[in-house]
């Protein structure tokens, strides 16, 4: 039975770090990776990310691994942009509310 080791790609310097976590089930392992990657998007709005992935024969060759990593990294960057946009939007709405409140106090 194949086991799946969790790896972490530090995007700041493209260093791959093997973790001590192993999974017996690929679906549990992939779900864990998705959740960890999603948490990175939500928590580190303006910081570099760690990207979680597995060692697995699920990928036939290095090109497939690179393609998959590239797709996932693009997904994370896209999610970051969406989150940043939402935060900027909330920030501008908050400033607008504060500005309206100050103007109301002046009247």
Regions found by a protein language model. Give the residues of each.
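Short, mixed-charge low-complexity intrinsically disordered segments
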Residues: 18, 38-107
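A short, charged, amphipathic alpha-helix used as a generic interaction element across diverse proteins
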Residues: 24-43
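A short, exposed loop/beta-hairpin motif centered on an aromatic-Gly-Thr core
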Residues: 15-27
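Short aromatic-glycine-(Arg/Gly/Cys) micro-motifs in beta-strand/loop hairpins
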Residues: 1-17
